[in-house]
Amino acid sequence: MSMQPELKVQRTPPKGGFHAWHREHGVGEISHRILVWTIYLNDIPQGEGETEFLEYGMKVQPKKGTVCFFPAGFTHTHRGNAVYTHDKYIATGWYYLA
């Protein structure tokens, strides 16, 4: 396993988010991803900006300093729910099967 050398930092403005259900493992350049990590860089009010997992009905509320690890495959299809009142900041990356 190896860690992606780049750190991806994202800003999500109010009403933004990655609303489509997706997974981090697929074809092409993402085909070797096996584990995802996300660090929440700021607090977001309850009910906004959660990382939601389809199969589990589970939502992770963004709280500054919290790290979320999950498998990249179909078992953890997820989305980023909209934020309404604040910008949301995350750092994210992947572990690859090299």
Identify the function of each model-found stretch.
Residues M1, G28-I30, Q61:
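Extracellular/lumenal carbohydrate-interaction signature centered on repeated Trp-anchored short motifs
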Residues M1, R11, V83-T85:
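A short beta-turn/loop motif at secondary-structure boundaries
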Residues M1-L7, G47:
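A short coil-to-beta-strand element that immediately follows conserved catalytic motifs
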Residues P5, G17-H19, R33, H76:
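Short beta-strand or tight-loop elements
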Residues K8-R11, A20, C68-F70:
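Structural recognition of the beta-strand scaffold that forms the well-ordered cores
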Residues V9-P14, V27-Q46:
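Short, conserved beta-strand element in jelly-roll/cupin
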Residues F18-G26:
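Histidine-centered catalytic micro-motifs
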